[in-house]
Protein backbone atom coordinates (compact mmCIF):
# COMPACT_ATOMS: atom_id res chain seq x y z
CA UNK A 1 0.00 0.00 0.00
CA UNK A 2 1.41 3.40 -1.00
CA UNK A 3 2.11 6.02 1.63
CA UNK A 4 -0.45 8.79 1.99
CA UNK A 5 1.43 12.07 2.31
CA UNK A 6 -0.44 15.36 2.77
CA UNK A 7 1.17 18.75 3.33
CA UNK A 8 -0.84 21.54 4.96
CA UNK A 9 0.87 24.73 3.87
CA UNK A 10 0.56 28.40 2.86
CA UNK A 11 2.21 29.34 -0.42
CA UNK A 12 4.40 32.34 0.61
CA UNK A 13 5.56 30.80 3.88
CA UNK A 14 9.36 30.64 4.23
CA UNK A 15 8.76 27.75 6.62
CA UNK A 16 6.32 25.78 4.51
CA UNK A 17 8.65 25.91 1.52
CA UNK A 18 11.20 23.91 3.52
CA UNK A 19 8.88 20.91 3.67
CA UNK A 20 8.06 21.23 -0.05
CA UNK A 21 11.75 21.27 -0.96
CA UNK A 22 12.58 18.27 1.24
CA UNK A 23 9.75 16.20 -0.22
CA UNK A 24 10.85 17.02 -3.77
CA UNK A 25 14.50 16.32 -2.96
CA UNK A 26 13.38 12.84 -1.95
CA UNK A 27 11.00 12.39 -4.89
CA UNK A 28 8.03 11.86 -2.55
CA UNK A 29 4.58 12.20 -4.09
CA UNK A 30 2.37 14.34 -1.86
CA UNK A 31 -0.96 16.12 -1.79
CA UNK A 32 -0.60 19.86 -1.23
CA UNK A 33 -3.40 21.56 0.67
CA UNK A 34 -3.37 25.34 0.85
CA UNK A 35 -4.42 26.80 4.20
CA UNK A 36 -6.20 30.08 4.83
CA UNK A 37 -4.39 31.25 7.95
CA UNK A 38 -7.22 33.63 8.81
CA UNK A 39 -9.71 30.79 8.68
CA UNK A 40 -7.77 27.66 9.56
CA UNK A 41 -9.20 24.36 8.47
CA UNK A 42 -10.55 21.84 10.99
CA UNK A 43 -7.85 19.46 9.75
CA UNK A 44 -5.05 21.91 10.60
CA UNK A 45 -6.50 22.53 14.06
CA UNK A 46 -6.85 18.80 14.59
CA UNK A 47 -3.37 17.92 13.37
CA UNK A 48 -1.54 20.78 15.09
CA UNK A 49 -3.66 21.63 18.15
CA UNK A 50 -0.70 23.07 20.09
CA UNK A 51 0.61 25.77 17.72
CA UNK A 52 -2.09 25.70 15.02
CA UNK A 53 0.56 26.58 12.42
CA UNK A 54 1.75 25.35 9.05
CA UNK A 55 3.51 23.40 7.75
CA UNK A 56 2.05 20.12 8.92
CA UNK A 57 3.09 16.90 7.22
CA UNK A 58 0.48 14.17 7.55
CA UNK A 59 2.03 10.78 6.84
CA UNK A 60 -0.45 7.91 6.81
CA UNK A 61 -2.73 9.89 9.11
CA UNK A 62 -0.03 10.91 11.59
CA UNK A 63 0.98 14.59 11.87
CA UNK A 64 4.51 15.96 12.04
CA UNK A 65 4.79 19.67 12.92
CA UNK A 66 7.43 22.44 12.88
CA UNK A 67 9.23 22.98 9.60
CA UNK A 68 12.74 21.68 10.32
CA UNK A 69 11.35 18.82 12.40
CA UNK A 70 9.33 17.94 9.30
CA UNK A 71 12.48 18.12 7.13
CA UNK A 72 14.37 15.82 9.48
CA UNK A 73 11.45 13.38 9.54
CA UNK A 74 11.36 13.32 5.73
CA UNK A 75 15.10 12.65 5.65
CA UNK A 76 14.81 9.75 8.09
CA UNK A 77 11.72 8.11 6.57
CA UNK A 78 12.80 8.37 2.92
CA UNK A 79 16.46 7.70 3.60
CA UNK A 80 17.29 5.95 0.31
CA UNK A 81 17.74 9.14 -1.76
CA UNK A 82 19.49 12.52 -1.44
CA UNK A 83 20.45 12.60 2.26
CA UNK A 84 19.65 15.97 3.81
CA UNK A 85 21.42 15.65 7.16
CA UNK A 86 25.02 14.40 7.31
CA UNK A 87 25.65 10.90 8.65
CA UNK A 88 28.42 11.98 11.03
CA UNK A 89 26.97 12.74 14.52
CA UNK A 90 29.12 15.84 15.03
CA UNK A 91 28.22 17.28 11.63
CA UNK A 92 24.53 16.56 12.31
CA UNK A 93 24.79 18.42 15.61
CA UNK A 94 26.47 21.35 13.88
CA UNK A 95 23.77 21.46 11.20
CA UNK A 96 21.06 21.56 13.88
CA UNK A 97 22.97 24.30 15.72
CA UNK A 98 23.08 26.52 12.63
CA UNK A 99 19.43 25.90 11.80
CA UNK A 100 18.56 27.04 15.32
CA UNK A 101 20.71 30.13 14.75
CA UNK A 102 18.92 30.84 11.47
CA UNK A 103 15.46 30.82 13.02
CA UNK A 104 16.52 32.51 16.27
CA UNK A 105 18.46 35.36 14.67
CA UNK A 106 16.82 35.92 11.28
CA UNK A 107 13.09 35.60 11.84
CA UNK A 108 12.47 38.59 14.10
CA UNK A 109 14.43 41.19 12.11
CA UNK A 110 13.04 39.80 8.84
CA UNK A 111 9.53 40.15 10.26
CA UNK A 112 10.20 43.75 11.29
CA UNK A 113 11.62 44.61 7.88
CA UNK A 114 8.28 43.64 6.34
CA UNK A 115 6.06 45.19 9.03
CA UNK A 116 7.74 48.41 10.20
CA UNK A 117 9.28 51.61 8.86
CA UNK A 118 11.64 54.37 9.91
CA UNK A 119 14.09 53.83 12.75
CA UNK A 120 12.60 50.48 13.74
CA UNK A 121 13.03 49.16 10.21
CA UNK A 122 16.60 50.51 10.01
CA UNK A 123 17.49 48.68 13.22
CA UNK A 124 15.92 45.50 11.86
CA UNK A 125 17.96 45.76 8.64
CA UNK A 126 21.19 46.11 10.62
CA UNK A 127 20.35 43.10 12.81
CA UNK A 128 19.43 41.08 9.73
CA UNK A 129 22.69 41.88 7.93
CA UNK A 130 24.73 41.17 11.08
CA UNK A 131 23.18 37.71 11.37
CA UNK A 132 23.71 37.06 7.65
CA UNK A 133 27.39 38.02 7.99
CA UNK A 134 27.82 35.42 10.73
CA UNK A 135 26.22 32.84 8.45
CA UNK A 136 28.50 33.90 5.60
CA UNK A 137 31.53 33.31 7.83
CA UNK A 138 30.24 29.82 8.62
CA UNK A 139 29.60 29.15 4.92
CA UNK A 140 33.19 30.11 4.04
CA UNK A 141 34.20 29.14 0.52
CA UNK A 142 31.85 26.15 0.35
CA UNK A 143 29.14 26.10 -2.33
CA UNK A 144 26.58 25.02 0.30
CA UNK A 145 26.47 24.96 4.08
CA UNK A 146 26.63 21.19 3.72
CA UNK A 147 29.88 21.48 1.73
CA UNK A 148 29.45 20.20 -1.81
CA UNK A 149 25.97 18.92 -0.97
CA UNK A 150 22.71 20.85 -0.64
CA UNK A 151 21.50 19.98 2.84
CA UNK A 152 19.74 20.78 6.11
CA UNK A 153 20.99 24.33 6.69
CA UNK A 154 20.58 25.22 3.02
CA UNK A 155 16.93 24.16 3.14
CA UNK A 156 16.40 26.28 6.25
CA UNK A 157 18.03 29.27 4.57
CA UNK A 158 16.18 28.87 1.28
CA UNK A 159 12.99 29.95 3.01
CA UNK A 160 14.69 33.26 3.72
CA UNK A 161 16.43 33.42 0.34
CA UNK A 162 13.00 33.30 -1.28
CA UNK A 163 12.14 36.58 0.48
CA UNK A 164 15.46 38.39 -0.08
CA UNK A 165 14.35 40.27 -3.19
CA UNK A 166 11.04 41.37 -1.69
CA UNK A 167 12.75 42.47 1.53
CA UNK A 168 15.32 44.52 -0.39
CA UNK A 169 12.64 46.29 -2.43
CA UNK A 170 10.41 46.92 0.58
CA UNK A 171 13.16 48.35 2.75
CA UNK A 172 15.48 49.86 0.11
CA UNK A 173 18.67 48.00 0.95
CA UNK A 174 20.94 45.44 -0.68
CA UNK A 175 22.26 42.22 0.83
CA UNK A 176 24.83 41.23 -1.81
CA UNK A 177 27.42 43.99 -1.14
CA UNK A 178 27.48 42.96 2.52
CA UNK A 179 27.34 39.20 1.99
CA UNK A 180 28.57 38.35 -1.54
CA UNK A 181 29.53 34.74 -0.78
CA UNK A 182 26.22 34.02 0.93
CA UNK A 183 24.36 35.56 -2.00
CA UNK A 184 26.27 33.35 -4.44
CA UNK A 185 25.17 30.31 -2.45
CA UNK A 186 21.62 31.66 -2.29
CA UNK A 187 21.47 31.98 -6.08
CA UNK A 188 22.82 28.44 -6.41
CA UNK A 189 20.11 27.13 -4.08
CA UNK A 190 17.35 29.07 -5.83
CA UNK A 191 18.28 27.44 -9.16
CA UNK A 192 17.97 23.92 -7.77
CA UNK A 193 15.12 21.95 -9.35
CA UNK A 194 13.43 21.05 -6.05
CA UNK A 195 13.51 24.73 -5.07
CA UNK A 196 12.27 26.06 -8.41
CA UNK A 197 9.33 23.64 -8.19
CA UNK A 198 8.54 24.78 -4.64
CA UNK A 199 8.76 28.57 -4.88
CA UNK A 200 6.46 31.16 -6.39
CA UNK A 201 7.50 34.08 -8.57
CA UNK A 202 9.36 36.82 -6.68
CA UNK A 203 6.91 39.46 -7.94
CA UNK A 204 4.03 37.50 -6.43
CA UNK A 205 5.90 37.34 -3.12
CA UNK A 206 6.55 41.10 -3.30
CA UNK A 207 2.86 41.80 -3.91
CA UNK A 208 2.02 39.66 -0.89
CA UNK A 209 4.60 41.55 1.19
CA UNK A 210 2.93 44.87 0.30
CA UNK A 211 -0.37 43.41 1.48
CA UNK A 212 1.27 42.56 4.81
CA UNK A 213 2.42 46.16 5.15
CA UNK A 214 -1.08 47.45 4.49
CA UNK A 215 -2.45 45.15 7.19
CA UNK A 216 0.04 46.66 9.64
CA UNK A 217 -0.76 50.17 8.33
CA UNK A 218 2.84 50.78 7.29
UniProtKB/Swiss-Prot annotation:
Q: Does the keyword Cytoplasm apply?
A: yes
Q: What is its EC number?
A: 2.5.1.18
Q: Which GO terms describe its biological process?
A: glutathione metabolic process; toxin catabolic process
- State a single Pfam family of this protein: GST_N
GST C-terminal domain segment(s): 88-208
The catalysed reaction is: RX + glutathione = an S-substituted glutathione + a halide anion + H(+)
Key words of the record: Acetylation, Cytoplasm, Detoxification, Phosphoprotein, Transferase
**Which sites bind glutathione?**
13-14, 39-40, 53-54, 66-67
Which positions bear Phosphothreonine?
149
Provide GO CC annotations from the record.
Answer: cytoplasm; cytosol
Where it mainly occurs, coarsely classed, is cytoplasm
- Modified residues annotated as N-acetylalanine in this record: 2
Reply yes or no: does the keyword Cell membrane apply. no
List locations, semicolon-separated: Cytoplasm, Cytosol
Q: Which GO terms describe its molecular function?
A: glutathione transferase activity
Per the record, the domain of life is: Eukaryota
Q: Where is the GST N-terminal domain?
A: 3-82
Q: Which PANTHER family match?
A: GLUTATHIONE S-TRANSFERASE U22, GLUTATHIONE S-TRANSFERASE, GST, SUPERFAMILY, GST DOMAIN CONTAINING
| Protein family membership | Belongs to the GST superfamily. Tau family.
What this protein is reported to do is described as:
May be involved in the conjugation of reduced glutathione to a wide number of exogenous and endogenous hydrophobic electrophiles and have a detoxification role against certain herbicides.
What is the protein's given name?
A: Glutathione S-transferase U22
What species is given as this protein's source? Arabidopsis thaliana (Mouse-ear cress)
Amino acid sequence: MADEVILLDFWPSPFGVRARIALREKGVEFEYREENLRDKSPLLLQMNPVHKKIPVLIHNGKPVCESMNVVQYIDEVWSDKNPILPSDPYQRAQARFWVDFVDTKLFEPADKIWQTKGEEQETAKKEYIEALKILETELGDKPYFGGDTFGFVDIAMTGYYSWFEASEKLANFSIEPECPTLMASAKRCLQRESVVQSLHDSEKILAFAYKIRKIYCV
